Amino acid sequence: FGEDEAQLLTQRTLKVLRHRFVGAPPTVEQVQDVVEQMLVDANHTKTFRAYATYRDQRHRLRQDKRTLVDVASSVEEYVDRADWRVQANANQGYSLGGLILNVSGKVTANYWLSHVYPPEIGQAHRDADYHIHDLDMLCGYCAGWSLRQLLYEGFNGVPGKPEADPPRHFSTALGQMVNFLGTLQNEWAGAQAFSSFDTYLAPFVRNDGLSYDDVKQHMQEFIYNLNVPSRWGTQTPFTNLTFDWVCPEDLREQVPVIGGVEMPFTYGELQKEMDMLNRAYIEVMTAGDRRGRVFTFPIPTYNITADFPWESENAERLFAMTAKYGLPYFQNFLNSDLSPNMVRSMCCRLQLDLRELLKRGNGLFGSAEQTGSIGVVTINCARLGYLFKGDEKGLFARLDHLADMAKDSLEIKRKVVQRLMDDGLFPYTRRYLGKLRNH
């Protein structure tokens, strides 16, 4: 058709748009819907088909642009500190490592949203209906590891990498723990945790015949080394330790093994050594570094049980540290049907009831300490409350839908991470974990 017909159709389109969209401008898709309607009403079938094809091509181009990362702006926004992500993580400073992580993170996040998740799941994140955490990492969220396994087997088993036998001394055990946590942190987005820190290390203190000053010196080295920003992005490894304080019942009669040799004592006979370890840890954390700055990691969790020694000197030190820095988490087992061996605290977002995992078999030490989280999704409840004010039924219907999508996103992530693990992308995780059945 000619120019006059085009002008007429344009005027009709503008009239419809002004009538339909009062007070808010229409979207690109809404404008194109009206254009198609005008072409159909005017019996311009050939033009309608051509326009529909053009529209589809432009839609695909817009989607592709959303996936592409502008290289120049990505680098310059970080260097100029114009990107909000520069200040998004208190554990990451402005640095070359931070720049590398920031740029690669944008690529990885777009890969998740546009090429892994279904369109509806990715769009819900982009529209802020919920937030899928750690999209900048192509891996799982957090993991709790078996300290007993590391001490019994040593840090080894990955082809082409240095291998170490099981540690025979306290200092060696701490050194392997630092290497283990730092290395595994590179294969996970979030926290790395060990449970029963004081229980499992007490045999090394007894066997080496260490004095308290010796223990404290080694503890200083251990804590300092865990706070060095050696993680990708020039970050400090996010580490957690759980302290039993008193030997758990399920370990009291068990005999420790050091370097393949059974010791002439049980875990339950080592309360003195456990007290030394707890005192050393608390005093080093309370003192901080050479400038008195608090050590951020490892974050301690203390199990509060019926036999917790409230009036002891160590308890005084513990609560003085808590008052000064607010460092520890406390796991309260008083008046609870749970016992310390039934719960593992992984990080600030995750606590696991191991009774649920034990239903899947393998026994306590086959599953309990090798647990964690695939990922975290936060639903935008504030928006739901605003949108569905006075409509409780509608609110819960929408919440159910978002929760289902969040669940689906995590199940998809589980399959992706497991496949990548099987293919060797996470060699140390495959060596010490193997499967994500308890995550």
Predicted regions located by residue number:
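Conserved catalytic cores of very large enzyme subunits
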Residues: 57-439
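Charged, amphipathic alpha-helical regulatory modules used
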Residues: 1-74, 78
